[in-house]
């Protein structure tokens, strides 16, 4: 009973609480919230105390460990042998002790490892000694390797980075300069490039792309407001920090512009370059960045580039024509924004104001405008307000109110003019006029008032002169000194820095005067760290990050190795392409996707086919031998009939076959032994297989480029075409060999189509004696054509050619041994004009490419830059065109060229084996059709020569390596280009080197090493297959860079690189 009563009392006690008025319930809820807030505050205070204690303990431990390390700025001498224990916080927030071995110390920073390589130096990861877990990026630039022009570019980059303070631009903290190097301490963005992010996640949605693009627009708009232009915007130069914030890097190509003027420096990456850069027109800075932003936005929303091509000619043509397609799945607003930015005419292209006000960015317009006004500008406004208030107080104490108002107006106009970045000269003129008016007005006043007004005017003039001096030296317009009070600075950070050993007054002065020293950099590092921690603790930001990364894609996208952007990644390992080295010991006629497991099985099958072909050749050639001899006896004065070998490959075959008989005395012996061994009138199985591999285009050249369907078709057609091609080639060789009994050294050539434009290369082993051999061969050819019935002359001629061939073969063997260990074999790529080959070849890889700076006349330092292809008809007295103009015009001339240009090449005889004639077949991997010469030998008294070098064994890599220069993929890998043949160009180089009396040694037929004036350098002739030209490459091995450049300029000035 008692328990029941207690329960009733408890219920009665609860009932009034349940029936309490509404306002009483609200009071109780408010009290509960206040209690919860107090508890949270207490927890936060406890956490802050714990963090402070942890920091003090870490600083104490680090200082003890750093005292053991010898303090030195030299990174080589300052590295400690024992590893340094540094507490590094992981991405999950848990602190873990990791043993890091610093490579050295630079100021207050420990250098850990190399994280990248820039245009002018390396970028290393560093840790601050006094701030735990604070990472920085240290860009190290070796001043000894910089010429005056690049040194100016580095200094300009530093000045522009000092000017820019934006949350989406990488920040410069400190500059340390020594006699040897320049150290730039910059902000570290640890999430990597946007390109890596897209390769890992695929195509971005429009909302994700909008967040990235909003930050890019905000940063670029801020740069343009500071009169700075980036000129190298691309996803590789966009980094991400831990809070998914864009950080723009690499201001090495940036410059300052003035409104209404034009820039003349042509730089950037080809796939992101605007049409005015390609056409070498003068341009205004913002339009170039707008075009690059359009390409970046296209890449963000589609996952591939809008302009792409197999080579630079096709790429530039698409850019100049504005030929691109926008996917249909994009919204109308996104399509319109991309189309407005990718306008070929820079005058009609969208401006930054139009981009900010575009409907696609309407939701983020306020973010762009708010982030454009950075802390520096806000502080500048506060400084102006303080100055105006002080001046008003001074003016109130004066008697003459009219003059005071004029001074206030002048001061306001002067300061607002610096904020709006107007012309400095106009501002100075206005200030001088205003000051003169003030002086005239002050003449009517008292002497005291005149003195005060003149002092104010002098102060204004001093402020204006500081800005004009910067403008005259083409430096960015720097903001005035930020007169920050101690109240504006973060007192917690200052107290922490004072505890670390910094003096309060020096610290405040360095921050106020915007100095880039140790004190200011440490302050800004702690400020940035505090801002990042506050952003990470915000729940809204964490939710946004989760939503950003978890947002589903509207279209399927390839990621990882299957991403279409993987080939544009600068550090990605390149796959085997047409220009990559390949071994030619194995038979070249195989499919492009053959695996290594089936390699030996294919070799066995080919050997069986070759053995079957040998028996077929013997029986067929014995039947044809008598008929061919009768035909040649009756028609020995007529030129050989043209034979055209066609195959069913996917590309057109343009190989040239030249057949030389060295011994006519051995014909009888060889004819008697036809039943047992193949003689001069037959071709061995190895030779027929080599002809087959040379006539058909090597599918190895199309590796990783031919689609799967084309590869399957090629594999199916290989089995059907092997037998037909070998029989046709053997019949052609027998006809020519039998006809050459009376006239040796006859060649079969055909009319080359206008698509075959690669210049002819002479045999590599006879480069030193090319002139003598050419003259002797031409005279021998003329004498043989005029005296076909004279056997004595033929015997003497053949013996002379045989002796020369054996001598050249000995020279080739010696050079093979020297060059086989140091040089690599590279196969030729297809011609620029071959349409079918271009469709099957691999797409152009966009490495970071920097064009050269040109003046109005296309020269730099008085030296012409022939980086691109120039037309052969260009004469010396004509005005020199720009490299890109000549590059495009020469491509048009190549397509229209027919038989105007004579292809001269020297046919050299090779060594003989067992007194048998050898068949020399051109083995250029570039496919060609057989040239047929219909000219009559009686009228012209001259035989047409083949336009490709003669190679004894096409399957041997060492000999093919010797007879062709090294392949260079891109134009910027050489110093200059020319249409001359490689042997002729080598003779020109040797002639110029001899005129300057420079001692040199010939390391290879197309490579020499020179040493003079304490400078050692090499000169190499390279091959540019994409442009069908030869390049000249200079490389400094040792010595002073100044003397090396002067020597190279002298040598290039004396070389005649234009083809005649």
From Swiss-Prot:
Keywords: ATP-binding, Kinase, Nucleotide-binding, Serine/threonine-protein kinase, Transferase. The active site is at residue 232. One of its GO terms (molecular function) is protein serine/threonine kinase activity. One of its GO terms (biological process) is intracellular signal transduction. Residues 109-361 form the Protein kinase domain. It comes from the Eukaryota. Residues 1-52, 67-88, 409-488, 560-701, 714-886, 899-966 are annotated as: Disordered. Residues 1008-1057 form the KA1 domain. Residues 577-594, 761-770 have a biased composition (Polar residues). It is an enzyme of class 2 (transferase). GO terms for cellular component: cytoplasm. This is Probable serine/threonine-protein kinase MARK-A. It comes from Dictyostelium discoideum. The lineage of its organism: Eukaryota, Amoebozoa, Evosea, Eumycetozoa, Dictyostelia.
